[in-house]
Amino acid sequence: MFASRSDLQSRLCWIILKATLYSSWFLGVFPYRFDSRNGQLKRSRFLLFYGLILNFFLLLKMVCSGGQKLGIPEAFARNSVLENTHYTTGMLAVFSCVVIHFLNFWGSTRVQDLANELLVLEYQQFASLNETKCPKFNSFVIQKWLSVIGLLLSYLSIAYGLPGNNFSVEMVLINSLVQFSFNCNIMHYYIGVLLIYRYLWLINGQLLEMVTNLKLDCSVDSSRIRKYLSLYRRLLELKGYMVATYEYHMTLVLTTGLASNFLAIYSWIVLDISMNINFIYLLIFPLFLLVNVWNLWLSIAASDLAENAGKSTQTVLKLFADLEVKDIELERSVNEFALLCGHCQFNFHVCGLFTINYKMGFQMIITSFLYLIYMIQFDFMNL
């Protein structure tokens, strides 16, 4: 997968994946152990209930200790809309954590099936191509991990940087663990989507190699086309299963991220206009906004990347039509492959509401901006 991990980027990606695995085990959000005899994951009841109890205990401890009460009391007293927005966003974040951890417990069997299918694809179907380096896969994994670390640092800067916040070390530690556990959960879906993209990228590379061989008048075995057709069909089924498993997770993540971005911008406006806050303190909010948007956008970009890789397969297959293919069986296999690509695409359509891609991401940005304008007009006299 990582080209023998010979270069820095591949080694760093490998370390991040290992760190994600061990962190998920420690926090109980990946309740599986590896069975070396058959090379498959098996669900561990101990890890399953350990994760459920630990994460709900942390959430209960955070709520009881007022872990969501980050902010400036004077700003809340001056602007009730900001206070209500702040508490609503906090409640939404807690609700999202509760639901996602419950779904992680309830759907553990489905996640196990997904992970085992990915293991089969990685070490059996694509074993001969594991040494091929996929730069975008490595880059996206590294960026996601950096954004998660950035969110933790942003939280610490808000907890200790804003005047009026006085939190104990225990409360900050609990809140940080809750946030990190939440992000580890989402990281599993994110890596799964990137693996689907990587397999599609490998298939496209092999198809391009076959086109090149045909141009050089070299023979091409039609069974290879049928093999990649079968793999493409399995990836489509895997994508559908992954969407069905994680659609509620991603809906809550996108909703919570959207609300957090809006809260950061509105807090920045209120503190800048209504109160005489030091400029250094005001930098905390745009930094948090930048990191949060980056983290949210990476989840959208990963799905868009896989979708475009599926479209690229159809483009590569069209190259066969430009060649004089004399093998009837090869031509039939290519046509069948092209027909499948034309009718089935890698659209990550969640909850029957929207498809996660760049178009949806830009629509989210426009919606947030329009809603922010509405809130400013509604609460203009209090600013």
Curated annotation (Swiss-Prot):
Residues 33-45, 108-144, 272-279, 382-383 are extracellular. Glycans are attached at N130. Signal peptide: none annotated. It is found in: Cell membrane. One of its GO terms (molecular function) is taste receptor activity. Pfam families: 7tm_7. InterPro entries: 7TM_chemorcpt. The chain crosses the membrane at residues 12-32, 46-66, 87-107, 145-165, 251-271, 280-300, 361-381. Taste bristles in the foreleg and labial palps. Its main location: membrane. Residues 1-11, 67-86, 166-250, 301-360 are cytoplasmic. GO terms for biological process: monoatomic ion transmembrane transport; sensory perception of taste; signal transduction. Keywords: Cell membrane, Glycoprotein, Membrane, Receptor, Transducer, Transmembrane, Transmembrane helix. It is a multi-pass membrane protein. It comes from the Eukaryota. One of its GO terms (cellular component) is membrane. Belongs to the insect chemoreceptor superfamily. Gustatory receptor (GR) family. Gr22e subfamily. Probable gustatory receptor which mediates acceptance or avoidance behavior, depending on its substrates. This is Putative gustatory receptor 22c. It comes from Drosophila melanogaster. The lineage of its organism: Eukaryota, Metazoa, Ecdysozoa, Arthropoda, Hexapoda. The gene is Gr22c.
